């Protein structure tokens, strides 16, 4: 996973901004999260988001717009408890965000295929403060974390 993230970061840094500001800009965004749940259990998440930014004004420069980001995320979350085996979940969610914050709804899936609803909220740009609520059957669990993401515009990478 580290090799793939390093490669994606290198690709993203290799291509600069081409000055074009299309209405839709598809992107791919790898991310890594570290955090604690309300019981002080450490967790780590690795994810990949596919999405698009939408320019919601007719301004010429992207910086003069209020872009909206829509995305679909797929990831893995691991919980590390003392003297217990690591518990792994797959997850997916759909999210909407503006530049400095957003929300998402989705599901965690355990190794037996059971699903649990997950709501997530974040603030920040490439470094995010996160808050998740996971609904494990009758129990709601709160998660707090730090997330690093690196959005890469697909068309600028491919056609630059």
Predicted features and spans:
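Sec-dependent N-terminal signal peptides
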Residues: 4-13
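Short glycine/proline- and aromatic-enriched beta-strand/turn motifs that initiate or cap beta-hairpins
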Residues: 17-67
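Outer-membrane beta-barrel proteins and related beta-barrel translocases across Gram-negative bacteria
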Residues: 21-31, 118, 122-130, 160
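Transmembrane beta-barrel strands of outer-membrane/channel proteins
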Residues: 30-36, 72-80, 94-96, 103-109, ...
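Solvent-exposed loop/turn segments connecting transmembrane beta-strands
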Residues: 32-46, 78-89, 107-118, 134-144
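Outer-membrane beta-barrel "beta-signal"
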Residues: 46-50, 141-160
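Outer-membrane beta-barrel architecture
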Residues: 47-51, 93-97, 120-122, 147-149
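Repeated loop/turn-to-beta-strand initiation elements of outer-membrane beta-barrel proteins
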Residues: 54-62, 67-71, 99-105, 125-131, ...
């Amino acid at each position: 996973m580290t090799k793939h993230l390093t490669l994606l970061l290198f690709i993203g840094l290799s291509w600069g901004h081409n000055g074009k500001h299309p209405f839709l800009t598809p992107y791919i965004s790898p991310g890594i999260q570290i955090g604690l749940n309300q019981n002080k259990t450490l967790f780590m998440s690795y994810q990949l988001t596919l999405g698009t930014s939408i320019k919601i004004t007719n301004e010429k420069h992207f910086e003069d717009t209020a872009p909206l980001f829509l995305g679909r995320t797929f990831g893995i979350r691991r919980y590390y408890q003392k003297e217990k085996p690591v518990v792994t979940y797959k997850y997916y969610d759909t999210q909407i965000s503006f530049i400095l914050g957003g929300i998402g709804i989705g599901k965690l899936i355990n190794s037996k295929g059971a699903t649990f609803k997950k709501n997530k909220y974040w603030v920040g740009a490439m470094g995010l403060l996160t808050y998740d609520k996971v609904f494990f059957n009758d129990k709601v669990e709160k998660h707090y974390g730090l997330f690093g993401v690196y959005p890469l515009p697909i068309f600028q990478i491919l056609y630059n």
